[in-house]
């Protein structure tokens, strides 16, 4: 499931970067789910994964969260957590996590999340490209772009070509 490509980094450093980012996403998923299901309430835990300023771009919006308060606030990730609580969200798993190392301080992560409700039914397939940067606090998501369900090319798995 995980792939890495290197651009100007040594194989050893690329391997470590991929390992570090995989570890971050292995912690991120459960933290996000626990917050969204109400098992925990320490919203500051999200700051272990996000770095301000945080840019999030979707098909109908482009928002910039300039500081930690904006990230955690109702117009930021705090609002997303609240919406999921109200929608009977219960679980999310990372179906794809392809890491493309850009250099020793940046990587793109092509991820596909599967969100499920309390009965286990699929609520949403959420594809996102993350720009992850090495900050003074460690690896942090600094930008996220919601994409069609697909890869960096933007060609979704659910699209068909008419050849």
Say what each PLM segment does.
Residues 41-105:
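A solvent-exposed, acidic/Ser-Thr-rich amphipathic alpha-helical stretch
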Residues 115-123:
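Short, cysteine-centered beta-strand-loop-beta hairpins and adjacent loop/turn segments enriched
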Residues 2-6, 123-158:
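Short beta-strand edge/turn micro-motifs at domain boundaries
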Residues 57, 109-110, 142:
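Beta-strand residues in well-ordered beta-sheet regions across diverse protein folds
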Residues 25-32, 50, 76-81, 113, ...:
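Hydrophobic alpha-helical core bundles mediating ligand binding, dimerization, or RNAP-core interactions
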Residues 94-100, 112-115, 127-133, 146:
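Hydrophobic/aromatic beta-strand elements that line small-molecule binding cavities or substrate pockets
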Residues 1-52, 159-163:
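Short, low-complexity N-terminal intrinsically disordered segments enriched in polar/charged residues
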């Amino acid at each position: 499931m995980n792939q890495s490509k290197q651009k100007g980094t040594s194989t050893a450093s690329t391997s470590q970067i991929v390992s570090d980012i995989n570890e971050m996403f292995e912690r991120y998923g459960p933290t996000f789910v626990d917050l969204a299901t109400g098992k925990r309430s320490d919203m500051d835990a999200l700051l272990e994964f996000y770095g301000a300023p945080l840019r999030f771009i979707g098909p109908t919006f482009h928002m910039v969260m300039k500081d930690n308060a904006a990230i955690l606030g109702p117009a930021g990730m705090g609002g997303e957590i609240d919406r999921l609580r109200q929608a009977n969200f219960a679980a999310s798993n990372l179906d794809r996590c392809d890491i493309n190392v850009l250099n020793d301080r940046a990587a793109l992560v092509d991820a596909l999340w599967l969100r499920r409700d309390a009965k286990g039914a699929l609520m949403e397939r959420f594809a996102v490209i993350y720009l992850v940067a090495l900050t003074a606090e460690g690896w942090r998501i600094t930008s996220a772009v919601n994409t069609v369900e697909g890869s960096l090319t933007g060609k979704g798995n659910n699209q068909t070509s008419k050849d």
